From Swiss-Prot:
Subunit-structure text: Homodimer.
GO molecular function: ATP binding; pantoate-beta-alanine ligase activity
Binding site for ATP: 30-37, 148-151, 177, 185-188
Family affiliation: Belongs to the pantothenate synthetase family.
Keyword Protein biosynthesis: no
Keywords associated with the record: ATP-binding, Cytoplasm, Ligase, Nucleotide-binding, Pantothenate biosynthesis
Localization in the cell: Cytoplasm
Protein name (Swiss-Prot/TrEMBL): Pantothenate synthetase
Length: 286
């Protein structure tokens, strides 16, 4: 039986007696759930006895002019999906419950790791992620928390947050889930028109081509790497996208300095297609 809580105190009271002999997992979401979210739930169930899914469209991670007001809110449908998936508890608080004072005077800043990739065009986004995730960790006090690898930078920031604030929480990165045609699943995919939806899988196709080049091409320096990146950006833009960024870094998101050792890299991209800002990434091991 799935139980939904709107109040922090009610959820904490339900979880309190379970802590002595149950392992608790948290899956934070903003709702409008798809198969990618359900894969996070299934992974959480493999690692814990009790699964809590939060549904909260967090206003602090939206910038001016972004889609806070239009972001799909589908709590009834989400509840049905989570019930069918066997989730134990849903936490669906109001903005007032999460933030008695708006904007919240306390901030959790991620530092340098939040200032590139998505942070370049969304400079306050990860500050908002930091405060909401910190609050959710404090409210739920999970043993395990599951985040999707589609938001690769966010996952790295959460791991840093857990390490720096000494949370005793295991962070699990869940594999990116794709549609049959290769498009990374996202709640914002519904912003795509029918024509744009047909174009959208090309983003992943171009990443795959770049990944193969990175595996097969001897790269001696950053100049050669940037030439491959710029060529891929041009191809993506020519396909109808507007690239926000495309970067290749080490898988911890640090800058590549060793071009001769084992490649443990990640390609990360954000690109606009119509009204949809699409994120994707591919890990390169070779």
């Amino acid at each position: 039986m799935t139980i939904t809580f709107n109040a922090i105190q009610d959820l904490q009271q339900a979880l309190h007696p379970l802590r002595t002999d149950k392992k608790i997992a948290l899956v934070p979401t903003m709702g409008n759930l798809h198969d990618g979210h359900i894969s996070l739930v299934k992974l959480a169930q493999e690692h814990a006895d009790v699964v809590v899914v939060s549904i909260f469209v967090n206003p602090t991670q939206f910038g001016v002019g972004e889609d806070l007001d239009s972001y799909p809110r589908t709590l009834e449908a989400d509840t049905q999906k989570l019930t069918e998936a066997g989730v134990d508890y849903i936490f669906a608080p109001s903005v007032e419950e999460m933030y008695p004072v708006m904007p919240p005077p306390t901030q959790v800043l991620a530092g340098a790791i939040s200032q590139y990739l998505c942070g370049k065009s969304r400079p306050t986004h990860f500050d908002g992620v930091g405060i909401v995730v910190t609050k959710l960790f404090n409210i739920v006090q999970p043993n395990v928390a599951v985040f999707g690898k589609k938001d690769y930078q966010q996952l790295a920031i959460i791991k840093q947050l857990v390490r720096d604030l000494s949370y005793n929480i295991e962070i699990i990165g869940a594999p990116l889930v794709r549609a049959v045609d290769g498009l990374a699943l996202s709640s914002r995919n519904q912003y795509l028109t029918e024509t744009e939806r047909q174009i959208a899988p090309m983003l992943n196709q171009h990443l795959s081509k770049l990944a193969q080049k990175l595996k097969n091409t001897p790269i001696a320096n950053n100049q050669q790497l940037q030439a491959l990146i710029e060529d891929t950006i041009a191809q993506i833009n020519n396909a109808g996208f507007r690239v926000d960024y495309l970067e290749v870094s080490n898988q911890d998101l640090s800058k590549i300095t060793d071009f001769y050792g084992q490649k443990q890299w990640v390609i990360a991209v954000a690109a606009w297609l119509g009204k949809a800002r699409l994120l994707d990434n591919q890990e390169v091991n070779g």
